[in-house]
C-alpha cells in the first residue's frame, strides 16, 4: 500500500525543549541512586529519562508521554538476573550444558525483542492515544535468526539486507492507536548506503598504504644522525605512533556517522500512514561535528557532560524531523480517538513485565 500525499501538504515540525541544566540534575540523581541501591533504582532512572525526553518533544503544540511503570521494568530486570544466575551456576557445575543455554537464548531472542518493542510502544502516547506494536514469533525469528545466519554465510554481504528488514519489521508492525504505519523503502536503498561507506573505507586504505611508506622514513630521519637509532621518547616517534589514530579515528567516525545519518533519513522518509508521511533532513557534516565534539567533551569532562551531549544530539535530530499531513492533525487525532473508543480496547493492555535490553 502506498499513500499519495497532496502537492502542498501541511508540514508540522518536531520541536525539542530539553535543557542541559535540567537534564543534568535528573541524570546525576539517577546515577547516584542507581549506585547506592545496587542498580535497583535504575528502573526508575530509565522511566525518568524517557519521560523527560518525551515531555520535551513537541508536535503541533502537544508533547509526548511515557507511561511505563518502573516496577514492571524492575521485574523484567530481576527476571533476567535470575535467569543469568541459573545459567552461571549450571554452567559452573555442568560445563557441557552451556551450548544448551546458548541455543535457548537464540531461540528466545525474537520473543524478547517483540516483547521489548511492544512494551515500549504501548507505554508511549500522544494526545492520550497510545502507540502500538504487533508482531509474532515466526516473523521475528526470520528477521533476528534467519537473516543473521544469512549474513554470516555471505561473510557480511547480506548485512545491508538485514538493516533493511529490521527497519521494515519495526515500522510495518508499529501503529498509532488503530492505525498502522507502512514502510515503502527497498533493500537497494540500504545497499547503496553501505556501498558508499565501503568505497570510502577502500579509499582510506589506499591512502594509508600510499602515505605510510613515504611518512615513516621522513619521521625517522627528522632529528636522527647517521648510525643512530631514534630515541624511544623522541617526539617524532610519538607523533608517528599517534598519527594513525589521529587520522584514522575521525575518518572511521565520519563513515559511521554517514551510515547512521543516511539510515535514519531513509527510515523516516519512507515511513508513512494514511495521509501522513515523515520527513527527515539530517546532514552528515553536522551530525559528524556533533558526535566528534560530544566525544571530546565527554572524554575531557570524565563523563560529566553526558547530559549535555544527549540533549544536543536529541535537539538536532528532532528539529530536523517533520510530519507532512494532508489534513489538520486535530481532526486526525479526533477520528483516531473515536476508532479506539469503538474497539473498547484503548490499547491499555500492556505487559506487566519489561524485558527490554
Segments the model singles out, each with a brief description of its role:
Residues 28-47, 106, 144-165, 292-312:
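Hydrophobic, aromatic-rich membrane-embedded alpha-helical segments
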Amino acid at each position: 500500500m502506498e499513500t499519495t500525499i497532496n502537492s502542498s501538504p501541511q508540514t508540522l515540525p518536531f520541536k525539542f525543549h530539553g535543557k542541559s541544566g535540567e537534564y543534568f540534575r535528573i541524570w546525576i540523581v539517577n546515577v547516584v541512586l542507581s549506585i547506592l541501591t545496587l542498580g535497583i533504582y535504575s528502573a526508575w532512572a530509565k522511566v525518568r529519562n524517557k519521560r523527560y525526553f518525551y515531555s520535551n518533544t513537541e508536535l503541533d503544540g502537544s508533547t509526548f508521554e511515557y507511561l511505563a511503570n518502573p516496577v514492571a521494568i524492575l521485574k523484567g530486570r530481576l527476571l533476567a538476573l535470575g535467569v543469568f544466575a541459573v545459567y552461571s551456576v549450571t554452567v559452573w557445575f555442568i560445563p557441557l550444558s552451556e551450548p544448551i543455554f546458548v541455543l535457548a537464548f537464540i531461540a528466545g531472542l525474537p520473543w524478547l525483542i517483540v516483547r521489548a518493542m511492544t512494551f515500549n510502544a504501548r507505554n508511549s502516547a500522544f494526545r492520550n492515544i497510545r502507540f502500538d506494536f504487533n508482531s509474532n514469533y515466526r516473523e521475528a525469528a526470520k528477521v533476528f535468526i534467519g537473516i543473521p545466519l544469512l549474513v554470516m554465510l555471505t561473510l557480511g554481504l547480506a548485512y545491508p539486507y538485514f538493516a533493511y528488514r529490521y527497519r521494515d519489521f519495526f515500522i510495518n508492525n508499529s501503529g498509532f492507536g488503530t492505525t498502522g504505519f507502512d514502510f515503502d523503502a527497498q533493500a537497494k536503498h540500504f545497499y547503496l548506503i553501505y556501498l558508499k561507506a565501503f568505497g570510502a573505507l577502500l579509499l582510506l586504505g589506499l591512502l594509508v598504504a600510499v602515505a605510510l611508506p613515504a611518512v615513516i622514513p621522513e619521521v625517522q630521519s627528522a632529528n636522527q644522525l647517521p648510525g643512530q637509532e631514534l630515541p624511544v621518547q623522541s617526539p617524532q616517534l610519538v607523533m608517528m605512533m599517534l598519527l594513525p589514530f589521529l587520522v584514522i579515528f575521525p575518518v572511521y567516525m565520519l563513515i559511521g556517522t554517514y551510515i547512521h545519518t543516511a539510515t535514519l533519513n531513509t527510515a523516516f522518509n519512507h515511513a508513512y500512514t494514511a495521509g501522513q508521511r515523515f520527513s527527515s533532513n539530517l546532514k552528515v557534516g553536522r551530525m559528524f561535528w556533533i558526535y566528534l565534539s560530544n566525544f571530546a567533551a565527554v572524554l575531557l569532562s570524565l563523563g560529566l557532560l553526558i547530559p549535555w551531549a544527549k540533549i544536543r544530539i536529541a535537539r538536532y535530530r528532532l528539529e530536523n524531523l517533520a510530519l507532512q499531513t494532508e489534513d489538520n492533525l486535530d481532526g486526525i487525532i479526533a477520528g483516531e480517538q473515536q476508532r479506539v473508543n469503538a474497539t473498547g480496547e484503548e490499547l491499555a493492555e500492556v505487559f506487566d513485565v519489561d524485558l527490554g535490553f
